[in-house]
A protein has these predicted regions:
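C-terminal ends of transmembrane helices
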Residues: 1, 26-40, 85-95, 141-152
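Hydrophobic, membrane-inserted alpha-helices
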Residues: 53-57, 109-115
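Structural signature of hydrophobic alpha-helical transmembrane segments
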Residues: 8-22, 68-80
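Short, structured motif recognition centered on aromatic/hydrophobic residues
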Residues: 1-3, 74-78, 82-91, 113
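Alpha-helical transmembrane segments of multipass membrane proteins
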Residues: 25, 29, 61, 81, ...
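Helix-coil boundary and interhelical linker segments in multi-pass alpha-helical membrane proteins
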Residues: 2-12, 57-71, 116-126
Length: 157
């Protein structure tokens, strides 16, 4: 909507809904019957995959509207993070983006990788490369508790 892409792509192409609904059902079933390893939960892995997919799709959409790469990076990051925030609002959890593990930074790095390599390799390969970068960084950040430094401001009182 920010770039004038109307109607919203997932409202016209049923393939997105056809992927989202079974994935949601499988995630619910998996969480019910699966005992995750102590440091990495299935919801974290699914969130990393969703962040990777939607960040790259958002950047690709921006580039398809002839927007410049820095804007595509911003749009990709917004798209990737917004989906996770909507999910977090609907569930009683602390939003992943508000936790200290690398989240937005993983999306930024992965989308930058995608925009840099897409001129040199086929589009699908560039998308997969960007998604793998985001997914790998996010999962590594969760598993090894890699944190982004928090900027603290002095209290003026």
């Amino acid at each position: 909507l920010l770039i004038g892409a109307t109607p919203v792509f997932w409202a016209v192409d049923p393939s997105y809904i056809q992927i989202i609904i079974p994935t949601t059902v499988l995630s619910i079933l998996a969480l019910r019957f699966y005992t995750p390893p102590p440091k990495l939960y299935l919801v974290d892995v699914a969130d990393a995959a969703g962040l990777a997919l939607f960040a790259i799709l958002g950047a690709q959409k921006a580039l398809s509207y002839q927007l410049i790469e820095p804007v595509a990076v911003i749009m990709g990051v917004i798209t990737g993070i917004a989906g996770g925030m909507i999910r977090d609002v609907l569930t009683p959890t602390t939003p992943f983006v508000m936790r200290s593990e690398m989240y937005a930074l993983a999306a930024i790095i992965g989308v930058v990788v995608y925009t840099l390599v897409r001129s040199y390799i086929p589009e699908t390969a560039a998308m997969i490369t960007g998604m793998l970068a985001i997914f790998s960084l996010r999962v590594a950040a969760i598993y090894w508790q890699i944190q982004v430094p928090i900027i603290k401001f002095k209290d003026k009182t």
